From Swiss-Prot:
Source species of the chain: Paenarthrobacter nicotinovorans (Arthrobacter nicotinovorans)
Pathway the protein takes part in: Alkaloid degradation; nicotine degradation [regulation]
GO molecular function: DNA binding; DNA-binding transcription factor activity
NCBIfam families hit by this protein: TransActPmfR (NF045769)
InterPro entries: CdaR-like_regulators, PucR_C-HTH_dom, PucR_C-HTH_sf, PucR_dom, Trans_act_PmfR
Keyword ATP-binding part of the UniProt annotation: no
Effect of inactivating the gene: Cells lacking this gene do not produce the MabO protein in the presence of nicotine, in contrast to the wild-type. Transcription of the nepAB genes and of the mao-ORF55-nbr operon is abolished in the mutant strain.
Assembly information from the UniProt record: Forms oligomers in solution, probably homotetramers.
Biological process, per Gene Ontology: nicotine catabolic process; positive regulation of DNA-templated transcription
Annotated keywords: Activator, DNA-binding, Plasmid, Transcription, Transcription regulation
Protein name: Transcriptional activator PmfR
Length: 470
C-alpha cells in the first residue's frame, strides 16, 4: 500500500494548529517531510526540499523587492512553504510578496499566537515517522558505500545515484569541467531539477544534483552526501595535483636539456615518437589550463616559461588539446612539428612568437610559412643549415658577431631599413656597409629571394645551433 504523505493542506485543515493561508494556495498539496524554525537571514541555505520554514519574522526582509526575492529563494530551494508566526517581529508583508507566492504556488501561512512552533514540528514528525526511518536506513547504506570512496570514486558515485535516485556530478568552478560523475540515469525527464552545492573541503569544486520531480534528496541526507563525496574528491584532487606537478618538473628538465625519468607515465608509451608541438598561451591563463589538462588526464606536459605558459603535446594529442583550449576560450600559438626533444627550447620560442603575433581574431594560431622544423629535426641538422648558409658568419669573432647580429636584426624587422638602423643604434649608411660585407663573406645577396629564404632558415635555426655551441 502506498504510504500517505503529509501535505501543507493537512496542516492548514488541522484546527488545533490554528494556521491560515495568506498566499500561494495553489501549492497546498506540496509534501511536508519536516518543519524547522530558522531566523537567519538566509534560511534557504539551511532548509531543503519538502521542509516547512517556521519563523516569527526575523528572517523576513522589509523592502518589497527583498520580500519578493525571499519567496523566490525559498521556492527554488524546494521548501514546502513558510509559516509566519503572528508576532510583533514580523514586518509588514508587501503586495510583491503575495504576488510572487501566488505566481509560484508557494504557500505562505500565518500561525496564531497560541500555537507554538513545537506543536507544528511534532505533528509533522509523527506523520512522517516511517519516512524518517527510511531516511536513517538510507544514511546507514550511504556510509557503507563510503568505505571505497578513496579507492573507486566512480563506483561510489554510481552506487550513490542508485541509492538516492538522483544524478550526481562534481565539476570544477574555474574550468567548468566535470571532475567525476555517475553514469547517466535512465528515463531522466527533461524537467529535471538541478541544484549545486559547495563541497566542504574544496572551494573550487561544486556538486550538482539532478533530481526527479517530487523525489528531491532531503537536507537530512544531503549534508552526509556532501561529506562522503568530499572525501572521495580530496583523494582524486591530490592525484591530479601530483600529476600536474610532475608534468611541470619534467618540462623544466627538458628545457634544461635533460631527459626526465618516467616520461611515459604522462605522455604514454608512444611519447613523442611521431613528433611533438609546443603550444603557448598567456601566463594569466596558466592555472586554468594546467588544471584543465590534469582533470582531462591529457598526455601532455605543461609548465611556465618567461613570457608564456607552454604545453608540450605529442602529435596524437593535438585535437584533444585544441578542443580543450577552445572550450576554455583560451587563445594559443602553436609551433611546427619537431622530433628531437633537444629542440624543445626552439619549439617553445617558435610557439611564443606565433602567440605574440597571432592577434585576437582566432583562438588557435598554427605555424605558417616554411616550417623550419621540417628541415631541422635536431641540433645537428640546425648546425648544418647554419654553417652551410652563414659560413664564416657563424663564427665567434667580435667583428663577425656584429655582422651576424646586423643580419638577424634586418630579418627580424622584416627588411625595413629605418627600423633596423634604429634597433641597432646605427646610421643607414653603416647598415648598408654591413649588409655589403655580409654579401662578400657569405656570397649571398639579400636582394635575391632564394638567398633571403636561406638567410631566414639560418636565422630560425640559430637558437639550436648557438645552444649546441655553448
Amino acid at each position: 500500500m502506498e504510504q500517505q504523505v503529509l501535505t501543507v493542506r493537512d496542516l492548514v485543515t488541522a484546527q488545533s494548529l490554528g494556521m491560515k493561508v495568506l498566499s500561494g494556495a495553489g501549492g497546498l498539496d506540496r509534501q511536508v517531510l519536516w518543519a524547522h524554525s530558522c531566523e537567519l537571514s538566509d534560511p534557504d541555505r539551511w532548509l531543503g526540499p519538502h521542509e516547512l520554514l517556521m519563523t516569527v519574522g526575523l528572517c523576513v526582509p522589509h523592502s518589497a523587492v527583498e520580500q519578493r526575492n525571499f519567496i523566490v529563494k525559498l521556492d527554488e530551494a524546494g521548501l514546502s512553504g513558510v509559516a509566519l508566526g503572528d508576532h510583533n517581529s514580523l514586518p509588514p508583508l508587501t503586495r510583491e510578496l503575495y504576488e510572487e507566492a501566488d505566481r509560484r504556488s508557494f504557500p505562505v501561512l500565518l500561525t496564531n499566537q497560541a500555537t507554538p512552533f513545537a506543536a507544528i514540528g511534532r505533528t509533522v514528525a509523527a506523520a512522517t515517522a516511517t519516512t524518517q526511518t527510511m531516511q536513517v536506513l538510507k544514511l546507514s547504506k550511504l556510509y557503507q558505500l563510503s568505505t571505497y570512496a578513496r579507492t573507486d570514486p566512480l563506483r561510489m558515485m554510481n552506487d550513490l545515484q542508485a541509492l538516492l535516485r538522483a544524478g550526481l556530478s562534481v565539476f570544477d568552478v574555474q574550468t567548468g569541467l566535470t571532475i567525476v560523475e555517475g553514469a547517466p540515469l535512465e528515463f531522466m525527464p527533461t524537467s529535471v531539477r538541478e541544484r549545486t552545492y559547495a563541497l566542504p573541503g574544496d572551494s573550487d569544486s561544486r556538486l550538482m544534483i539532478s533530481e526527479y520531480p517530487g523525489e528531491e534528496v532531503s537536507s537530512f541526507l544531503l549534508i552526509h552526501v556532501l561529506q562522503v563525496i568530499d572525501v572521495a574528491l580530496s583523494q582524486l584532487l591530490r592525484s591530479l595535483r601530483r600529476r600536474s606537478e610532475r608534468s611541470t618538473q619534467m618540462l623544466a628538465s627538458i628545457f634544461e636539456g635533460r631527459s626526465p625519468d618516467g616520461l611515459g607515465s604522462i605522455l604514454g608509451p608512444s611519447g613523442t615518437s611521431s613528433g611533438y608541438q609546443f603550444v603557448a598561451v598567456a601566463l594569466e591563463d596558466s592555472e586554468k589550463v594546467a588544471r584543465a589538462a590534469s582533470i582531462k588526464s591529457l598526455p601532455v606536459l605543461a609548465g611556465p616559461g618567461s613570457s608564456s605558459f607552454f604545453i608540450l603535446m605529442p602529435e596524437q594529442s593535438r585535437n584533444d588539446v585544441r578542443n580543450l583550449l577552445h572550450g576554455l576560450d583560451v587563445r594559443a600559438g602553436v609551433s611546427s612539428t619537431y622530433l628531437d626533444l633537444r629542440d624543445a627550447k626552439a619549439a617553445a620560442d617558435e610557439a611564443a612568437k606565433i602567440f605574440s603575433s597571432g592577434g585576437t581574431n582566432g583562438l588557435w594560431t598554427d605555424f605558417t610559412g616554411v616550417p623550419v622544423s621540417l628541415l631541422t629535426r635536431s641540433r645537428k641538422e640546425a648546425s648544418a643549415i647554419v654553417q652551410q648558409v652563414l659560413g664564416r658568419l657563424a663564427g665567434t669573432d667580435p667583428k663577425i658577431t656584429v655582422l651576424r647580429e646586423t643580419l638577424f636584426a634586418f630579418l627580424a624587422n622584416d627588411r625595413r631599413w629605418n627600423e633596423t638602423a634604429a634597433a641597432l643604434g646605427i646610421h643607414r649608411q653603416t647598415l648598408s656597409y654591413r649588409l655589403t660585407r655580409i654579401k662578400e663573406i657569405t656570397g649571398r645577396d639579400i636582394a635575391s629571394s632564394a638567398d633571403l629564404s636561406a638567410f631566414w632558415l639560418a636565422f630560425q635555426a640559430w637558437p639550436s645551433f648557438s645552444d649546441r655551441s655553448d
